[in-house]
């Protein structure tokens, strides 16, 4: 963050990017970047690796909680069992559903659609990415 903020500080306002696309590095880092210039700089997160479904929903929940305004989740969506359903559930998480409730909802909907999940619900309930445990 220090390097990013120093780079931004050294630019004239008309030279600065409007959008930052970054990896989620925990609450403190996200809050720091998103509060730097909230009226002129949009902070967005990358989706990262596949992880579990809970990792996906926890990432979007925490990023939103700590100031991110955009999520760019290519792989997490493309590798999902049901792409439309995962996007719908991500939206529900952004709107207040917990990440654990999101996993339960997602698996329930897969079952209703007779789509076999890639992982059991017990495995998918786990948070496996360390940065999400902060």
Question: Locations of the language-model features?
Answer:
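Glycine-rich phosphate-binding active-site loops on the catalytic face of alpha/beta enzymes
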Residues: 45-50, 66-83
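Alpha/beta enzyme core
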Residues: 1-43, 54-69
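Residue-identity detector for threonine
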Residues: 7, 52-53, 89, 128
